[in-house]
Amino acid sequence: MRAVRLVEIGKPLSLQEIGVPKPKGPQVLIKVEAAGVCHSDVHMRQGRFGNLRIVEDLGVKLPVTLGHEIAGKIEEVGDEVVGYSKGDLVAVNPWQGEGNCYYCRIGEEHLCDSPRWLGINFDGAYAEYVIVPHYKYMYKLRRLNAVEAAPLTCSGITTYRAVRKASLDPTKTLLVVGAGGGLGTMAVQIAKAVSGATIIGVDVREEAVEAAKRAGADYVINASMQDPLAEIRRITESKGVDAVIDLNNSEKTLSVYPKALAKQGKYVMVGLFGADLHYHAPLITLSEIQFVGSLVGNQSDFLGIMRLAEAGKVKPMITKTMKLEEANEAIDNLENFKAIGRQVLIP
């Protein structure tokens, strides 16, 4: 089968012919119909998430097939699989655990001490076929097609969890930083659907700002043309926002947007751009604000976002479908900030 693999750090991904794996036990072989392209794939190709090196610090073994946003049809099942059959159209939660560590036992498998992350340290979906280590991490699709479903397994599950952590309700105001990207447009939709909160979207390109507006943001700010803090003070009548979801965590965003928080506000940190956080500790105490990390999502988050999408309440903003051979071009688009919404590869 054809597979697009990371062979050498910092170099273009390599299109290779490799064998089709055979599922055994609880494993499932999926014929990939759609693979979303995520900014994490940029970091993987670069070989680091900030200062964390994927090989030396995170234990990734090369070569590895990238692609963690996965949807497709079941081709074959192992002898321990129940409830699924060949031909079923499924989406796959790629953030899987080995099942025995403390975090797996409390239902937070995405924090597993020995994770099985497809497209990171296990072969992913930039290929014609992919092995799912355990069938319990699949969702049988009923209304969505594969292209619509694939981005939900990362951009959807990640922002669903972040919105949950933001503790929103109709009295609250949320600021989404990076609101026009694949994650940002999902965060806006999810927050609107589940909380009724007022949503402010901020981005730095006019087309991204327009995407955030189309996703349902009540207010949008172009930070390259407006003073974002002044606009936030105007919108909130000087109170500030009750929560920020920062999908970048860059030096720029972390130097600006914590200042947008109201008292008792939450700063939910999602992005992996690699900046350091510098904030005067007494201000945290005096305003009772919180900085909260949010990493992808667990099985409950996966089920939540899939049901929300199948009910028609949220929909990934797919801006481009591309061939498997164009994986490097798709990642280049993300790295150079040329992508709005989500790109999806079709093997």
From Swiss-Prot:
Cofactor note: Binds 2 Zn(2+) ions per subunit.
Cofactor(s) the protein requires to work: Zn(2+)
A Pfam family matched in the record: ADH_zinc_N
Reaction catalysed by this enzyme: a primary alcohol + NAD(+) = an aldehyde + NADH + H(+); a secondary alcohol + NAD(+) = a ketone + NADH + H(+)
The protein's Enzyme Commission number: 1.1.1.1
InterPro entries documented for this protein: ADH-like_C, ADH-like_N, ADH_Zn_CS, GroES-like_sf, NAD(P)-bd_dom_sf, PKS_ER
N6-methyllysine carried by residues: K11, K213
GO terms for MF: alcohol dehydrogenase (NAD+) activity; zinc ion binding
Residues noted as binding Zn(2+) 1 in the record, renumbered to the chain: C38, H68, C154
CDD domains named in the record: arabinose_DH_like
Keywords linked to the UniProt accession: Metal-binding, Methylation, NAD, Oxidoreductase, Zinc
Residues given in the record as Zn(2+) 2 binding sites: E98, C101, C104, C112
The keyword NAD is annotated on this UniProt entry: yes
Family: Belongs to the zinc-containing alcohol dehydrogenase family.
Quaternary assembly: Homodimer and homotetramer.
Protein known as: NAD-dependent alcohol dehydrogenase
Phylogenetic placement of the source organism: Archaea, Thermoproteota, Thermoprotei, Sulfolobales, Sulfolobaceae
